[in-house]
């Protein structure tokens, strides 16, 4: 959770635009989209390598994704706009929490390793808060953040507060550097909850 999450919501557009892309300096393109069912296995394997072997069980990951596909946006590279021979290189994942889930998160009672979908809004519904569940975007994050923003759109996500937990000192420093603050206490540390407020949809439209 140590990436520059602050830049996600301020950049979101009014309507979601799945599959947006941009050119890479070294050639080719990078794009984001909802992973296919088959690609979820690759996503899970990458998570175990890049984050931890003891992440949420695969059945939990699939249940969250089925409940709200916006929980996962895959990152892909390809030679050109045809997207032939596209390669999966990473992803962003979120828990789009309803009011009950948000309340549990603030109290420190939400099990984010085994989240129950009853605390997550279904697809198309505006969440009360967004918890950054995981990010794997090695060497491509600066290209991907605007694409994630466009894919989500401001209608459901603009103005929704972002939450994340710092797992490393480097991650905590990066989070503080982009504006995250302790959600429950000013001097929050490792393993504690951080919050970042994003502008409402009206402010995004006016920008």
Q: Which residue ranges define each predicted feature?
A:
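Residue-level detector of alpha-helical recognition elements and their boundaries
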Residues: 58, 100-101, 107, 147, ...
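GNAT/GCN5-related N-acetyltransferase fold signature
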Residues: 75, 92-94, 137
């Amino acid at each position: 959770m140590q990436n520059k999450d602050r830049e996600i919501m301020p950049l979101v557009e009014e309507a979601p635009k799945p599959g947006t892309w941009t050119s890479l300096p070294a050639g080719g393109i990078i794009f984001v989209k909802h992973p296919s069912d088959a690609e979820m296995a690759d996503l899970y394997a990458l998570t175990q390598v890049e984050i931890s072997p003891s992440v949420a069980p695969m059945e939990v990951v699939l249940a969250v994704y089925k409940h709200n596909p916006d929980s996962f946006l895959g990152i892909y590279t390809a030679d050109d706009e045809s997207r032939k021979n596209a390669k999966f290189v990473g992803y962003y994942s979120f828990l789009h929490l309803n009011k009950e889930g948000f309340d549990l998160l603030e109290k420190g009672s939400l099990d984010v390793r085994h989240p129950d979908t009853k605390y997550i809004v279904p697809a198309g519904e505006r969440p009360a808060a967004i918890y950054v569940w995981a990010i794997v975007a090695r060497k491509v994050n600066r290209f991907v953040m605007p694409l994630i923003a466009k894919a989500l759109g401001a209608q459901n996500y603009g103005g929704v507060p972002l939450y994340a937990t710092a797992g490393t000192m480097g991650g905590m420093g990066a989070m503080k550097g982009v504006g995250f603050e302790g959600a429950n206490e000013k001097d929050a540390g490792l393993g504690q909850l951080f919050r970042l407020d994003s502008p409402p949809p009206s402010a995004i439209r006016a920008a």
